[in-house]
A protein has these predicted regions:
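Rossmann-like dinucleotide-binding core of oxidoreductases
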Residues: 50, 61-153
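Short, glycine-/Ser/Thr-/acidic-enriched flexible segments
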Residues: 8-10, 21, 28-30, 125-128, ...
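Predominant activation on well-ordered alpha-helical scaffold segments within soluble catalytic domains
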Residues: 58-65, 155, 184, 205
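Conserved small/polar residues in nucleotide/adenosyl-binding loops
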Residues: 203-209
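Conserved beta-strand-loop-beta-strand element in the redox core of flavoprotein oxidoreductases
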Residues: 1-15
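Glycine-rich loop/linker segments at domain edges
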Residues: 143-202
Length: 210
């Protein structure tokens, strides 16, 4: 049996057989903290902000499992390195009375596109911990082993020239293609929310060169 449906004309039930199985397309479960913590504890722990659809609560998946469907043993989330938070804020869920399940991610900036650019990234101790030119997922998961599971991105006044030189591909190319005005708006918005800071003085050291 592939599916049992109910007619809208006379309410009788119809059975459709599926010899090769059923592929169910019903969305994911990023809007359900219970399922997120149970099925993807690592991905959940390194997430600072999420732009999911609130309706993605995994109800279709739960119904399918109840009916006997197989569920992947490991979750396969696509995490982007663009959810930014203020200093001192850890990655992972925080309590939220207004959110479904009473939990939400702390960040309100979910798509800071320049975050994907391979600028220097350091943990809370000022230590570089990963290859900044790695794909979206890699730098985020590398942060799982750092204090608070977060990091800081450091750039200078040559940011736009550097972005052009990096010439990243995929959706991260938006920062390069959109130009100076777009980049400035992104930085200004982050600064207003306490997530982006302009340095007044810079000091060099042997450690920075290393």
């Amino acid at each position: 049996t592939g599916i049992i449906a109910q007619s809208t004309e006379d309410d009788h039930f119809i059975r459709y057989n599926a010899n090769d199985g059923v592929l169910l397309a019903c969305g994911g479960f990023p809007g359900n903290p219970y399922m997120m913590e149970q099925l993807d504890p690592l991905g959940t722990s390194v997430t600072t902000a999420c732009s999911y659809s609130p309706s993605d609560k995994g109800y279709g998946i739960r119904a399918a499992v109840w009916a006997g469907a197989n569920l992947d043993k490991e979750a396969a989330p696509m995490l982007f390195d663009r959810g930014i938070v203020a200093p001192g804020v850890d990655a992972g869920y925080v309590d939220s009375e207004s959110a479904f399940g009473g939990k939400a991610f702390p960040g309100t900036i979910r798509q800071y596109n320049p975050g994907t650019q391979p600028f220097l990234k350091v943990n809370r101790n000022g230590e570089r911990f990963a290859n900044e030119s790695s794909p979206y997922n890699d730098i985020v998961y590398a942060a799982a082993h750092q204090p608070g599971r977060v990091y800081a991105q450091i750039c200078d006044a040559n940011i736009l020239e550097d972005v052009k030189r990096f010439h990243t591909i995929g959706c991260s190319a938006q920062t390069r293609n959109a130009g100076a005005e777009y980049l400035q708006k992104q930085m200004d918005s982050a600064e207003e929310k306490g997530c982006f800071f302009k340095a007044c003085l810079l000091y060099t050291s042997d450690a920075a060169d290393e």
